[in-house]
Amino acid sequence: MQVHRTKLLAASGGTLLFGILFGWVLFPQILKFMISKQVTLKPGTDVRELWSATPFPLHFYIYVFNVTNPDEVANGGKPRVQEVGPFVFDEWKDKYDLEDDVVEDTVSYNMRNTFFFNEKASSPLTGEEVITLPHPLLQSIGISVQRERAAMMELIAKALAIILPDAKPFLTAKFMDLFFRGINVDCSSEEFASKALCTVFYTGDVKQAKQVNQTHFLLSFLGQSNHTDAGRFTVCRGVKNNKKLGMVVKFADEPELDMWLGDECNRFVGTDSTVFAPGLKREDGLWAFTPDLCRSLGAVYKHKSSYHGMPSLRYTLDMGDIRMDEKLHCFCDDPEDLETCPLKGTMNLNRCVGGPLIASMPHFYNGDPKLVQDVDGLNPNQKQHEVFIDFEPISGTPFQAAKRMQFNMDMEPVEGIEPLRHQRKVIMPMFWVEEGVQLNKTYTNMVKHTLFLGLKFNAGLRWMLITFSLIGLMSAGYLFFKESDSLDVTMPPKIIKESNKVANQPTFAKQQQHQDQQSQSQATAAPNVPIPGVDLSNVKVELRERF
């Protein structure tokens, strides 16, 4: 029994140790190793195929702020806006001209976004709705010249009057014309002022303009972004170092930007937002470089979440407060003067796009309260206007995300241009967009069957081993306790031998022994001596054993 108790104790202890080591140490390392070998941008892998051409469209929503009192605002009144939308588009993402560098473990490519209007999802909106917005060309040129080239104001004012006859501070046009088809810009005039201004169109400095013939251009917010090159990236493939998967190394063949007033703001941090490395820690955040903003933005962990029954982590981001973060002072017009920094929740895009544009969260969510107070019709709230991503960190899979951004005109009075002379200084919201994705069951099942079933198997196995080992340990302990509580009496071998010898003596020996005992009794009996007055004839003497 003692041998069995020891074996049971050893087996149970070994099972307990194996369950702990395998469940919490070995299995996670094995899983991490397997994922690191599969999740790379090496040619031929599933991840490379999905990354290079997204097999499903993203949802792209556009919400427009229709100005309902344009004449009043032009005369210095408070703007009043009405949100119109969403206009829904299917956005397809693909990468082309891919070039791998095995030595550097990088891949270079051109990014392309293609938009298709989704009539069904946009209904009842058709895209032909008439919208009133700040005039994108008149406002941006007039304000930029006043701030940076005031000496040229007279020439520019004359050119604008020729190119944009009868232009007003606010432009009223159909949604599709404003955003995709374009509004006409006439550069056919032979006037010197007109030719001087139109030079920026012919050289391509106005990125939102598309040349249709020798003298005319079409200007739109997103027309030039549709099915065109969005920039050339160079990113890490993650073969040699999986932690660097997707990290941007170069953009436009440059290792960093050169437009901001500090290295911290010019650095590339994170990926191109279409892929993330597996095994990221919560405190690392999710960083991505955004060419539209000419900067990198990082989402921070907020809380645990779930998607289709699978656990995930929710990350959120906003524009922050540049004034309060010393590392971001390079985004100010003058890093030494905090008064030149943008308001909380905004970012000045003038250096990025060459115009008085301000980026923010939709409806100025999480921004300076003054931004909302200056415009009627805004209603910021977390559910509709927060940027978030539900992320599975082990595999690096984003389950669902909503990337939202609002674009605003940084308006101010322009003395040199009559239509803009009396307007008030205000950050005027124009439109906001949402790029959303939700993985369907086809792709969530891939994660579920390859990752979470393995995790569940590991959890079940380790707890089963621990349970059985604890039962075994308790059983062994009970057996030890039971045996130690009982008393085993063992006679010495010599006594046992003598006892057996006496027990085996023949009958005559026992009779002889009995006779000897009788003789001894008689010898020890009291002598028969007469005592006067005492009759001892009838006295019986009993022999008693002495103990």
Swiss-Prot record:
Pfam families: CD36. Its main location: membrane. The keyword Calcium does not apply. Keywords: Cell membrane, Disulfide bond, Glycoprotein, Membrane, Olfaction, Receptor, Sensory transduction, Transmembrane, Transmembrane helix. One of its GO terms (biological process) is sensory perception of smell. Residues 511-522 have a biased composition (Low complexity). Disulfide bonds join C265-C330, C294-C352, C332-C341. The keyword Membrane applies. One of its GO terms (molecular function) is scavenger receptor activity. It comes from the Eukaryota. Residues 29-460 are extracellular. It is a multi-pass membrane protein. GO terms for cellular component: cytoplasm; plasma membrane. The chain crosses the membrane at residues 8-28, 461-481. It is found in: Cell membrane. InterPro entries: CD36_fam. Glycans are attached at N66, N213, N226, N440. Residues 1-7, 482-547 are cytoplasmic. Residues 506-531 are annotated as: Disordered. Belongs to the CD36 family. Plays an olfactory role that is not restricted to pheromone sensitivity. This is Sensory neuron membrane protein 1.
